[in-house]
A protein has these predicted regions:
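Enzyme catalytic cores with a strong preference for nitrogen-chemistry domains
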Residues: 1-378, 394-403, 435
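ATP/NTP-dependent adenylation/nucleotidyl-transfer catalytic domains that generate, transfer
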Residues: 29, 177-179, 234-236, 245-248, ...
Length: 693
């Protein structure tokens, strides 16, 4: 395996091509196709999709019925077949072809000097500007037969003319796992039950649409809606290309739109109304698509119901060997640094609005269901407890209850800083909650002495026991206060901490009566608090404190810092949340292999100047990570993720927030508490052998 090879990492490079059309000049069009095919080959493309009827031109009307044109189309196709002999890509081009005494609007699949299959258009539009039934016929639904193609290359064994499948087919690469291509043509995408749907249910992971599609105002957005929808519903990649410059403008105009979607996400879109040939390239994640279908068992159920055991309904399969380059070709797709945080400002604002209100709605329902008790919460002046408190405040407002029913406690320990304690105090004061400070140091010192810990005898020993005595006492106080005052303890820990087991089990911050933050990753938490400030959920005084908290080092504040040293840092211990949330998303939502996560992380994080950052992200925090750093922290993530499952197995109730998933043992993530992650670490180490120490 080559760690830096996109093909070895489960991707395939695909392209949508639009080119200058020469109406009724097949050899000129073939030349354009061959020229772009050579460029696709040079760029390591596995599948290249061209527009509908690109060999002849689409808008040539009754010339489509002229034998002179059709004879020339076949000869031009023969020249494309011949030129493809030494080229990598599977080429899918559009042409009018005779079948018996009829004419079909076809896609022709060509690879390495052979015609692999011919796919006729299933649905012919005959309304508004379209009159395709004047020229073409359709084939019986799902029918597939074999026809002789004299121009289709040479049969490998007989040396005679080629007989190829004619109808619905699946084109599968035997050396690129998961690359199975299904083809439909233009109008096929616009009908209620599309050929693409049938092809996806039969196993196609990559769907190609050869389109002509003249442009009118708004049609570009309509196309994109359809492509996105099909790719999302079918858990597939979708390659779309439309006819462009050169098509007849007698009554219509053409924009040459190209786009590539994957499972509802846009990977690439081409500029419209361009002169000359235009190639839109993206690397589709085949492993992601296969994993998504495995996870969504209803996809397989739907396929079984649709085909119902009748093999005659299934497309014919054609197998090819691509032999793609296993070298570093880069990666032709954007990889989000923060997969839980969208870069688009409008989408980020919407996500924050929904996340915040999901948390509030979950807490409101729980309070109503159990008789509207008071809320007991420990407020440290850190991100998580701060956000839990603002969620609780909003919940009380919706319930029509006074915020004084939120009983806030700050519980300073041996390393609590003046800044965090001040912020906690001011936040509670400005929100109008009940507030009390309980110094846990005397009780912690006594407990350490009682158990014979060196600190109890005056020795500066700051080990895990020293830390957990403080964490445990805080939780113990909160639960006893809840008992005493008729409340519930509101948990504050977040999704990232749960993944890493960065919490104290049982009598510690792992436990609460209800936990509002367990579905929120740390990297989103900061944006949520910014959104709370920007959207004026509370007054300006609260906003100022929230901004101060945002600029505070993330720390458990359990170990005192020596004079001149920096305070205890969570990220120094368990890794940057930037990287750990990246890994968490790809484990939880994508089911990706560790080596692939490292590959993607390097693409996302190796250069801070490349790619986009979420709106409002501080300039000073825009950092980069080397592959060595990425692998170091991913190893730690894997070790902690497996070894700390026992904490998640006893997770309190709390709402799922992110589509990226949750770690609730009753929901998205079910895993034994006593398994080892050694094989996952070994897979990572084997892949990066020789690249990092």
């Amino acid at each position: 395996m080559n760690f830096h090879s996109l093909y070895d990492q489960g991707f395939a490079r695909v392209a949508a091509v639009t080119l200058p059309v020469h109406p009724a000049r097949p050899f000129e069009n073939a030349r354009e196709i061959i020229d772009t095919a050579r460029e696709l080959d040079a760029r390591g493309v596995a599948v290249g999709v061209y527009p509908e009827l690109c060999v002849s031109g689409y808008a040539i009307d009754d010339l489509l019925l002229q034998d002179v044109l059709l004879d020339t189309v076949e000869k031009a196709l023969g020249s494309i077949v011949e030129a493809s002999a030494d080229l990598l890509p599977l080429l899918i081009v559009g042409a009018p072809l005779r079948k018996d005494n009829a004419l079909c609007n076809c896609a022709v699949a060509i690879h390495r000097g052979r015609v692999l299959a011919i796919i006729p258009k299933s649905h012919l539009p005959n309304y508004r500007e379209f009159y395709e039934k004047r020229y073409f016929v359709t084939m019986p639904p799902r029918a597939c037969e074999r026809i002789e193609v004299p121009w289709g290359g040479v049969e490998e064994f007989s040396g005679g003319p080629v007989w190829v499948p004619f109808g619905q087919v699946l084109l599968s690469a035997d050396d690129v796992p998961g690359l199975t291509v299904g083809i439909e043509i233009c109008e096929d995408m616009w009908v209620p039950v599309t050929p693409a749907t049938e092809l996806a249910l039969a196993g196609a992971t990559v769907l190609a649409n050869l389109s002509a599609s003249p442009i009118t105002v708004g049609r570009g957005a309509d196309r994109e809606l359809m492509v996105r929808s099909v790719s999302a519903r079918c858990s597939a990649a979708y390659i779309y290309t439309a006819a462009g410059i050169g098509e007849s403008s007698t009554d219509l105009a053409w924009d040459g739109e190209t786009m590539i979607y994957e499972a509802g996400e846009r990977l690439a879109i081409g500029e419209r109304f361009q002169e000359g040939a235009h190639i839109t390239i993206a690397d589709v994640d085949l492993e992601r698509l296969r994993t998504e279908r495995k996870r969504q068992n209803s996809f397989t159920d739907n396929a079984q119901r649709y085909f119902a055991g009748d093999e005659r309904l299934s497309p014919q399969e054609v197998e090819i060997t691509l032999d793609p380059p296993r070298t570093d070709l880069g990666l032709e797709r954007a990889v989000n640094r923060f997969p839980f945080v969208p870069n688009d400002p409008t989408r980020l604002e919407q996500d924050c609005y929904e996340a915040y209100n999901i948390q509030v709605a979950g807490l409101v329902q729980r309070l109503r269901a159990i008789g509207n008790p008071k809320i007991v919460i420990g407020v440290s002046g850190g991100l998580d407890s701060t956000h839990a408190l603002v969620v609780a405040s909003r919940a009380m407002d919706l319930l029509g209850r006074p915020r004084t029913d939120i009983l806030c406690y700050t519980l300073p320990g041996f390393a609590t800083s003046e800044r965090t304690k001040t912020n906690a105090t001011l936040l509670c004061q400005y929100l109008g909650t009940s507030f009390q400070e309980i110094d846990i140091r005397p009780a912690a010192t006594q407990m350490l002495a009682d158990i014979g810990h060196p600190y109890g005898e005056g020795e500066a020993t700051y080990d895990v026991t020293f830390e957990n005595v403080q964490a445990g006492l805080r939780t113990d106080y909160l639960f006893r206060l809840a008992n005493h005052l008729g409340g519930i303890v509101l948990g504050t820990g977040d999704l990232s901490e749960l993944a890493l087991g960065w919490c104290t089990y049982g009598v510690g911050d792992q436990m609460s009566h209800y936990a509002v933050n367990t579905g929120v990753p740390k990297t989103l938490m900061q944006h949520l608090i910014r959104w709370v400030v920007a959207s004026k959920q509370f007054d300006d005084r609260v906003g100022e404190v929230l901004l101060s908290i945002l600029h505070t080092e993330i720390s458990p504040e359990l170990v005192p810092a020596k004079p001149g040293e920096k305070m205890q840092s969570t990220q120094d211990k368990i890794g940057p949340y930037n990287l750990q949330d990246f890994t968490l998303y790809h484990v939880l939502r994508r089911g990706a292999r560790p080596s692939k996560i490292a590959f993607l992380a390097e693409k996302a994080w190796s250069d801070a100047s490349v790619g986009s950052w979420p709106v409002g992200f501080p300039e000073e925090d825009k950092v980069a990570y080397s592959l060595e750093e990425i692998v170091k922290w991913e190893r730690l993530f894997l070790w902690r993720f497996f070894s700390q499952q026992f904490k998640r197995s006893a997770l309190p109730n709390g709402p799922k927030v992110m589509a990226g998933g949750s770690l609730s043992p009753r929901g998205d993530w079910r895993m034994p508490s006593d398994v080892s992650g050694a094989d996952w670490v070994a897979e990572l180490d084997e892949a990066v052998k020789g690249l990092v120490d």
